[in-house]
């Protein structure tokens, strides 16, 4: 049975989103084929990515935040969404630290439960 999920996610930086998708092994595409299920919904999105079995995660930006549309199965959807949001947060932090120039990432560690710990230091 086909399933389409839509949730609001706190993603604002399209470039960092693209990096996070790539890091998770998803590839960006311009659009999905017209014959593809839910193509109308996906093709209205600003960023479209597919996984190895052609399941889609698509992002439509509305008022500065992203709506995530996906046809992943519910369990896969939640797992992939959580991994994506974590990767996005890590990459956004690193980008922000680099842009600010006052801080530097000193250490990054992934804990056994999957939590990412990042140590940022300030040079004075």
What annotation goes with each model-predicted range?
Residues 1-124:
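Interaction-mediating elements
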């Amino acid at each position: 049975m086909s399933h389409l999920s839509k949730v609001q996610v706190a993603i604002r930086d399209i470039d960092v989103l693209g990096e996070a998708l790539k890091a998770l092994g998803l590839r960006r595409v311009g659009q999905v084929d017209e014959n593809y299920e839910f193509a109308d919904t996906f093709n209205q999105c600003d960023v479209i990515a597919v996984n190895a079995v052609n399941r889609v995660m698509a992002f439509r930006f509305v008022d500065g935040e992203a709506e995530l549309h996906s046809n992943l199965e519910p369990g896969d959807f939640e797992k992939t969404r959580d991994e994506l949001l974590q990767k996005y947060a890590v990459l956004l932090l690193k980008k922000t630290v680099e842009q600010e120039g006052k801080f530097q990432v000193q250490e990054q560690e992934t804990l056994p439960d999957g939590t990412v710990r990042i140590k940022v230091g300030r040079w004075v």
